[in-house]
Regions:
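P-loop NTP-binding module
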Residues: 1-248
Length: 248
């Protein structure tokens, strides 16, 4: 298997570690049949790739085998933001788009990362017709292969509210986790995304809140409108534990 280094991966602080440990634990309650998990958002810049990458790392550090697929064929920033370095010191390599276009075989796009227990399929190069590639049956075959190699397959997808790609990706997944920027997405937008994903037959596992203002977190009515979707509301769990500890 080819090697891949992740050269820009900031360490999480205490709150971040607690959040992702909680999320990782909660995934185990989703059921043994939930292995292929799409991570998406309503808008761009809501932290879906941050969520995907850190969930991959946290699971791997806990001894859980995990594969990450960068399926944002339109606007992926993973290669640059995380400093992916391929064999030979190159900053670009064969990836998902190359495989789906029939340019290389499946084994050419699966990389062992420098994180033990974590493998990765990078995005590859930009393509003019990503939707056509994602509807290719080879995409589902790739996810099935990765699911046979790992305990979880995390699929970083484009935002649901912007393009139709995520709906196609969801068809090949067992569940969806939605990254939501706190105080930045309306309830109706989230409901629209929820409906669009559910129409594909892919269950929604929950939401993960980003950019949370802890000081005002517990009292905001705005948050309460999301609470029934927040099965994996890992920031909520972290805040609740520490808030209660401070009162003792």
């Amino acid at each position: 298997m080819k090697q891949l280094k992740i050269t820009k991966f900031p360490a999480l602080d205490y709150a971040g570690n607690e959040a992702f440990n909680t999320l990782s634990t909660n995934l185990s309650f989703a059921g043994a049949n939930v292995k292929k998990i799409m991570i998406t958002s309503c808008h761009a810049s809501e932290g879906k790739s941050y969520l995907s990458m850190n969930l991959m790392r946290t699971l791997a550090q806990r001894g859980i085998k995990v594969a990450l697929v960068d399926a944002d064929l339109r606007r992926s920033l993973v290669n640059s933001d995380y400093g992916l370095q391929f064999e030979g010191g190159r900053n670009d390599g064969k990836g998902l788009s190359h495989f789906l276009a029939g340019m290389v075989g499946m084994d050419e796009v699966i990389y062992q990362t420098d994180i033990p227990n974590a493998i990765m399929v990078p995005v590859g190069r930009d393509v003019p017709n990503p939707l056509a590639l994602l509807t290719n049956h080879h995409f589902a075959e790739l996810l099935d292969m990765l699911a046979s190699m790992a305990d979880y397959v995390i699929v970083d997808s484009p935002p649901v509210g912007m393009v139709i790609d995520a709906a196609e990706i969801a068809k090949a997944c067992d569940g969806t986790l939605i990254a939501v920027n706190y105080n930045d997405v309306s309830r109706q937008e989230l409901l629209d995304v929820k409906q669009q994903i559910e129409q594909t037959g892919c269950p929604i596992l929950g939401t993960a809140l980003n950019q949370v203002d802890y000081d005002n977190y517990m009292g905001r009515k705005y948050y309460k409108s999301y609470s029934k979707y927040g099965k994996y509301g890992y920031y909520r769990e972290y805040y609740k534990r520490n808030h209660e500890a401070e009162k003792k």
